[in-house]
C-alpha cells in the first residue's frame, strides 16, 4: 500500500472530519485538485510551503484507494507529484498526526515516515 501525504492546517482537517471528506485547502481549490506529496517529497513541501507554520497535521493516505482520480503530474521543477481530482474520502486516510515545529524551526516528522 503506497502512502501519499497531505499537510494541512489542523482546523481545516477538523472541518473535513466533521464533513466526512476533505475538499481541499484554499490552494487546492484554486488549482482544481488536492496537492499531495510522496514520502520522499513531503519534507521539502513542508519547508517550501509551510515554513514556520505551526498547528499542522500530516495525513497519510492510501494512494491505491483513490483510484483513477489520483494522477502523478510534473511540478514546475519536473518532479512528479500526486494530485487528486476530487474530494478525499476519509476512508482512504490511514493516519493523521500532528506536525509540530522543532526548536530549529523545521517541522518534526514522525519516525514512521522513514520506515
Regions found by a protein language model. Give the residues of each.
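Conserved, structured core segments of small domains
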Residues: 1-115
